[in-house]
Each structure stands twice: as structure tokens, then as C-alpha cells.
């Protein structure tokens, strides 16, 4: 289910504060955040935000196509190593 329209999009207050400070600064730096639940706003476009995946912060460059999505959508939390192939299986006889 999606969020109610009357509530509007959510973004962490601390993240918005960091983004506003970054917009005023001349030098672009990576913004570190733990807020995977925050919605990407148009003011985030062009910034690099390091999103926490449970182990480390993964840098994500924000583009126009990402607006409206959540930050956590672009950083997977689980590492997929692939399914075991049939050649690797040993047959016990």
C-alpha cells in the first residue's frame, strides 16, 4: 500500500537539513544517512547520498528518474551469490 496523499511524502528532518546545507555550500560532499525510508525530493537531484545497507554506506548519485522513490530502493541489503549450478553438485552413489 502506498502512503496517503493527504499526508504527503516523508523525508527525515536531519537529511533535509543536510541537503539544504549542501545546496548553500560551494563544494559538493557525500551526505551520509541511515534513513532508507526517506522519499527522494527534486532538491536532492545532483547530490551523492551514502545510504546505509546494514554493513556500510553505499554512495548513490541522485538523478531525476529517482524522484518520488525511497532511498532504500537503490541499495540492496542482502548479497545475492547466485544459485548453485548443477555442475558443482556432487552425486553420492
Curated annotation (Swiss-Prot):
Keywords per UniProt: Ribonucleoprotein, Ribosomal protein, RNA-binding, rRNA-binding
GO biological process: ribosomal small subunit assembly; translation
One Pfam family this sequence matches: Ribosomal_S19
Family matches, as PROSITE patterns: RIBOSOMAL_S19
Domain of life per record: Bacteria
CC per GO annotation: cytoplasm; small ribosomal subunit
Classification via SUPFAM superfamilies: Ribosomal protein S19
GO MF annotations, alphabetized: rRNA binding; structural constituent of ribosome
HAMAP family assigned to the protein according to its UniProt record, in alphabetical order: Ribosomal_uS19 (MF_00531)
Record-stated family: Belongs to the universal ribosomal protein uS19 family.
Protein function: Protein S19 forms a complex with S13 that binds strongly to the 16S ribosomal RNA.
Protein name per Swiss-Prot or TrEMBL: Small ribosomal subunit protein uS19
Species for this entry: Lactobacillus helveticus (strain DPC 4571)
Gene: rpsS
Amino acid at each position: 500500500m502506498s502512503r496517503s496523499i493527504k499526508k504527503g511524502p516523508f523525508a527525515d528532518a536531519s537529511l533535509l537539513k543536510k541537503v539544504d546545507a549542501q545546496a548553500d555550500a560551494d563544494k559538493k560532499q557525500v551526505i551520509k544517512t541511515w534513513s532508507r525510508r526517506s522519499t527522494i525530493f527534486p532538491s536532492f537531484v545532483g547530490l551523492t547520498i551514502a545510504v546505509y545497507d546494514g554493513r556500510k554506506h553505499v554512495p548513490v548519485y541522485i538523478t531525476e528518474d529517482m524522484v518520488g522513490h525511497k532511498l532504500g530502493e537503490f541499495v540492496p541489503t542482502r548479497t545475492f551469490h547466485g544459485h548453485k549450478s548443477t555442475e558443482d553438485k556432487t552425486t553420492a552413489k
